[in-house]
Amino acid sequence: MSLNVRTLDFWQIIVLALSILIFCPLIALILISFGDSEGLWGHLLETVLIRYVKTTLFLMAGVSLFSLLFGIISAWILTNYEFRFSKVLEVLMLLPLACPAYLVAYAYTDFFEYAGPVQGFIRGLMGWKTASDYIFPEIRSLGGAIFVLSSVLYPYIYLLSRTAFRETPNSYYEVAQLYNRNIFWSVSLPLARPAIVAGLALVCMEVVSDFGTVEYFALETLTLGIFNVWIGMNNINAAAQISTFTFIFILMLLLVEIRSRAGKRFNDTSSRQTNKKAKLITGIEAFFCIAGCLIPVSLGFFIPILILLSNALTSLNFHNYYEVTKIFTNTLIISSIGAFCIMGVSTIIACTAYLSGKKYLRTVANFSASGYAFPGTMLAIGILVFIGFVDRTLDLFSSADSTFYLSGTIFMLIFAYIVKFQAVGYGAVLSGLTKTSPNLIWASRTLGMSFHKTISRITIPLIKKSIIAGGVLAFVDIMKELPITLLLRPFDFETLATFTYQFAHDELMGKASVPALLIILVGLIPVIFLNKILRTNI
């Protein structure tokens, strides 16, 4: 059913304009990649580009392997077995989602490096004096990055695997047992494969997009290559060309994720559509199950938290806390403004596209939400180029001396957040709309209420909880965002993420720990929301 009303046509134009505006930075990025890189692209192709690709692929492969092991094993244990603390572990398994990978990297580097407590304890215990007396794995390495990213990203696979395992009807297991087949390999894993692949695609997108961890560990990935060429070599055209190359990686992963979601359907036509009951276990079996779940969550949450807390307590500095409070206020303000703008734009786009019933409008709306999949360094180039074009256009109609109207301002940073995180708000609003009965909306239209009044008086109150949830998620994502804020922030403007980054790079982990803990503390909010949703729906 469609709302073919003149007022709706106006809102359709608004949606098209907003979607095009959000997509403009990616278009600008592609256009500038055709510019002259002064021979640097050819030089990069001959020297480091292959290394960037290899490192990115090895990192993706390693993180994928360990994320699969952590996620699938823990999901299988908590779905099929019931033991003491199993319900608590279901909640704890999602906690690493609250920790940005770069903060975990900072914590583990401080913990495992030569001057850290682990190697110091080993040297004291064994009587060793120098680094040449023993061999210890280097945390700032490809293996270290795989370890850090896997411990933080496995919840994507855990969450989708657990949902798929729990939705498998018991009748499937009964048939497998009848034919004496292993239920995990013959039933659960094949049926959960689309969900697992979708989670794996999300993990790989996060790996490709990661900046903080790979930059701190000095790993030459595509994302860090974009940053180095742009900032280090001052060649934005060559950086855009690497970004376009990375664009292909992202599109392939998006295609895999979309195809996996499309195949994530199976039906039980029997009359008994009950789910398999968890088996009650005790003793040594329960011990190993608890250990299997505690290992990943400890690596991704508890150990980094304890390291950061220890650093914060051993370097108390009230002047530093005053500075942190000031920057925390900055972060709250910019995150609140960004979240408000994101939810406003998302609500307009999602409501109009969904209620119009027009396929092309929904397609455009979906494209406007694609920015979340792309690395922050890549989007920053596109946004800077696009805003620069807008500034030059405004300069043609202005008599002011300055040519920087929007560049280097809070407005540009807010716009960058909208481009990056609009998918978060759009997904939340769309989820609320699909759960709302359309009859109330059609009834209001039948009674003569205009489209915008229907949206404001009927639709928005019905999806208010979804809008709030989306706003909270967007707020936390903005608060944790590092590369976009670092590259596009106004002069002398700090957030908790950039503040932590500066201190970590100066090897001042005591000062970096307090803002890092604040980021993680706020990051727990969406995890709490997620657990409430899971308890309601599963």
Residue ranges of each PLM-predicted region?
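Short glycine/proline-centered loop/turn elements that form peptide/ligand docking sites
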Residues: 168-171, 436-440
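Short, charged juxtamembrane terminal tails flanking transmembrane helices
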Residues: 178, 532-538
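Glycine-rich helix-loop "coupling/hinge" segments at transmembrane-helix boundaries
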Residues: 208-234, 404, 482-509
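The alpha-helix within a helix-turn-helix
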Residues: 175-177, 444
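Short coil/turn motifs that cap or connect alpha-helices
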Residues: 182, 449-450
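Membrane-interface interhelical loops and short amphipathic "cap" helices
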Residues: 36-52, 215-217, 222-237, 312-324, ...
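Membrane-water interface segments at the C-terminal ends of transmembrane alpha-helices
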Residues: 6-36, 47-166, 191-211, 241-258, ...
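Feature of multi-pass inner-membrane transport and sensor proteins
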Residues: 122, 169-170, 219-223, 252-288, ...
